[in-house]
Amino acid sequence: MTPSNTLQKLRKYLEGRTGKAIIDYNMIEDGDTVLVCVSGGKDSYTLLAMLMALQQRAPVKFRLIAMNLDQKQPGFPADILPRYFESIGIEYRIVEADTYSVVKEKIPEGKTTCSLCSRLRRGIIYRTAKELGANKIALGHHRDDMVHTLFLNLLFGGKLKAMPPKLVTDDKSHVVIRPLAYCAEADIAKFARGMEFPIIPCNLCGSQDNLQRQKIREMMQEWDKRYPGRTESVFTAMQNVVPSHLADADLFDFRGLTLDTPVDEGDIAFDAPEMPISGMIPISQTA
């Protein structure tokens, strides 16, 4: 089936956003071997599609290996991803590890399993990357994930911390990259529907989204309905940090501040912040 013009335009747009993120953060370099983690969800399918497309015309040469971790969850359709990988001609590795039973044994019934499951999964991914000689590990987190994580840490963890587009693993063996950092979840969802990817449900283990993360998601969706562009604005703020106007003494030398210390954005101590009014709804209309 030939993709529609709308889908082609969306693909081109997402490829552009992905390529820009890769360039801005120097995510992929010549000679890299990139392990692409594919769970069977819309995000990881889109990630793989973007990287394969960019590989064809990138000025640098890099190798892609798709990986899926079969955690032996009841009902997991183990044949779907191998068949899909073969149909698109991508080198791949299926890793089988019964982390499902381990988690069920360790975590009491009714308690969230996500934390332990994530740690086990991460260890297996790192080990597989080492076995395959991959120096980069690509994950399918997108812009919305990064913004939601910022608010999770801000509201529930007391930290101004989000999800970075690029990081080094604790053992210093690999660089983890998030090439979809500039892509909105809504665009990814539209693309995945248009491409008719064979989506595998993400709740086979019976666990639901972390309640706090779900609340953040609902909050951001409501904000974007009332004030369009808020998620994009928050993400832009993550790229424009002014340490001198926060309160972290490790990032800015407040103790050593003198009359000669240069301060970003000058003296605004007594000024009300000027906020853009475009897209904002007057308080009287929201009461």
Swiss-Prot record:
A motif (PP-loop motif) lies at residues 39-44. Pathway: tRNA modification. It catalyses: cytidine(32) in tRNA + S-sulfanyl-L-cysteinyl-[cysteine desulfurase] + AH2 + ATP = 2-thiocytidine(32) in tRNA + L-cysteinyl-[cysteine desulfurase] + A + AMP + diphosphate + H(+). It comes from the Bacteria. CDD domains: TtcA-like. It is found in: Cytoplasm. This is tRNA-cytidine(32) 2-sulfurtransferase. The gene is ttcA.
